[in-house]
């Protein structure tokens, strides 16, 4: 983003956790403690000021023929518009042949974005874990993840390039939108 020469309207902070488990040792309850600590204790001032938290999990692996963005429900409409109507939203090339699904996929507790979402920050994560039904994990998690088969060979340059372009464009779109487009209809309907 810096190399592109883009001049943001708002501050853009790159927060590199490295893993949701950072920040706790010698406990079986390390899941997402680092992200929780970051938003609740290290930078609680981000709540109410942050337009969006864009999280990446395994951004260079092609899990299936499609991708999606999991998010807070109030972001579903904005993400649908961005993916399907916004002129500068990139399409996948050389990966995700079925494109970007935008039916509205709820964020969940398996990644850093949930801690930010729970604290009140509109949050997203690339669709990396669950399939369309939002109940079945991609086979990667049963066959490869955290095993001896999880090697550099899983890296897919086209997927990485797409995710950088797509979420970079999304960050710029959010930055340039005078008021963040949030739609609370799906929350109301629950």
Regions found by a protein language model. Give the residues of each.
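His/Asp/Glu-rich mid-to-C-terminal helical/loop segments that flank catalytic regions of hydrolases
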Residues: 3, 10-12, 130-189
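Alpha-helical metal-binding/catalytic segments enriched in His/Glu/Asp
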Residues: 1-29, 167
